[in-house]
Structure formats: C-alpha cells, structure tokens
A protein has these predicted regions:
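Active-site acidic catalytic loop and adjacent metal/ATP-binding pocket
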Residues: 1, 98-144
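All-alpha amphipathic helical-bundle segments outside canonical DNA-binding/catalytic cores
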Residues: 174-185
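A cross-family kinase active-site recognition segment
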Residues: 28-85, 106-108
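Conserved NTP-binding catalytic cores of kinases and kinase-like/nucleotidyltransferase enzymes
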Residues: 1-15, 123-125, 233-235
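Active-site activation/catalytic loop segments of kinase-like enzymes and analogous catalytic loops
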Residues: 141-173, 187-204
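Conserved structural core of kinase catalytic domains
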Residues: 5-34
Length: 235
C-alpha cells in the first residue's frame, strides 16, 4: 500500500493498481434494516442505465434436483452428519419449491445477485452500503427484489409491503407478484445448502465441519417455504 502524490492510497491487487477513494466503517450483518431505505437502495441499483453482458448463471435459476438431494442425503447419513435428518425433513418442501423454477425471466439486466446481509450493511454515517459485486450479472430484477424480501422481511407481510412500496416509489422496475418471482432466492439458497453439505463431506477437521454445518444451519433454522413466500406476497 502506498500513497499517490495527491495523498490518495493506491494498492497493487493482483497486478492491477487500485486506488482507495474512501474508507467506510460498516456495522455487522443485520437483516433488520430500515425497509424504506432498503427499497430505495435496491431501486437505485436496478435503475442504473447499464444492461451488461455477464450472462445468466444456473446458480440463480436451476434446481439442485431430486436425484442430487437423494444422493447427498445418503452420503450425509453414511457419514453421520448431525443435520442430515433435519435436512431430510425439509426435502419435500425443497422439491415443491424447485417445481417453481424454469420459467424464462420477464426482464434481464445486470443485478448484484448477492444482496444478502453480509454484502448490504449500515455504514458509519447511517446510510446503506452495498459491496462485493463479484457475482454481478444478468438476472431478473423482480427476482432480485424477491430475494431482498426473503432476507430482510422474513415472513412479515407488513415489512415486505414497506420495502416494495419504497422500491416502487423510487422507480424500481421489478415487481414481485407471484411465487415464480422467487426463483432466484429458491435456486440460490438450495445451491448454498448443497455446497455446504458437500464441503462438510470433504472437510478434514472438526473446525471445517463445524464451519460448513453452520452454513447449512442458516437455512435449516430459517427455511424458505411455500407458506413463507405466500406471506411475502400478501398485499
């Protein structure tokens, strides 16, 4: 890290010169963000006049599938995974949700595609800060808005309404109107769980297994279900 003549900080990151324009102190991840600020921020992201060309990714659109879930559960049980029975109990619901996947996107534009609480936080000045755009690419803004409702409204229709209203008033182009609009969070959460399970299976230390079990339990403790989606669709 060195300073430019202007006093700005410059760092070499993988052979690329990167200049730091501003430091931000961020609060820890929090799903209880102000719904109006949140809705306006997501609308602002979706109104940026840039379509982009980084293509769609199966991670956000395609199911894991019944066969893969069955094989994964067999492996987890063979290794006595402590969460195997809890996951098995959710598989019927998981498969029912995966039946909602497969419809073409209503609209495509570059979206962040990872607006979970780890990447959207309150900054020291009280505003919201979005970072980690590594996964940005083409997606349906309606589906990204649905993912925001899942993360920050949980199953609270009133809070979901506040987020949607603020988003609409700020000119956001997405609309969450039906269960199929939740395709992005359904696919993404299921792939996250699958990845956590596979990492648990190959982990060689207790710490590694504990870390990946925690990943899986984030979903097990607050699963996305059809009833939760129905609650978020209430006007």
């Amino acid at each position: 890290m060195r300073r430019a003549r202007s006093g700005d900080l410059i760092a070499d990151v993988g052979g690329v010169a990167v200049r730091v324009h501003e430091w931000l102190d961020l609060d820890p991840p929090d799903t209880m963000l102000d719904p109006a600020k949140l809705g306006r921020l997501v609308a602002g992201l979706h109104r940026v006049p840039f379509v982009g060309s980084v293509g769609q990714d199966p991670w956000y659109a395609e199911p894991v599938g019944a066969g893969q879930w069955a094989a994964l559960l067999m492996s987890l049980r063979a290794r006595s995974a402590p969460f195997a029975d809890e996951l098995a109990a959710l598989v019927p619901e998981i498969l029912a949700l995966e039946e909602l996947l497969g419809e073409p996107a209503r609209a495509l534009r570059t979206c962040h595609r990872d607006l979970w609480a780890d990447n959207l936080r309150v900054a020291s000045g009280g505003g919201l800060s979005v970072f980690d755009f590594d996964n940005a690419g083409l997606a349906d803004p309606s589906q990204e808005l649905a993912a925001v409702l899942v993360e920050y409204a949980s199953a609270d229709p009133a809070k979901a309404r506040l987020i949607r209203d603020a988003y609409n008033e700020a000119g956001g182009p997405g609309r969450v109107e039906r269960s199929q609009d939740f395709a992005m969070p359904i696919a993404q959460l299921h792939h996250i769980v699958e990845a956590g399970c596979r990492r648990w299976l190959v982990a060689e230390t207790d710490a590694g297994r504990a870390d990946n079990e925690a990943w899986v339990r984030e979903f097990l403790d607050r699963p996305l279900t059809r009833s939760r989606i129905e609650a978020l669709l209430v006007e």
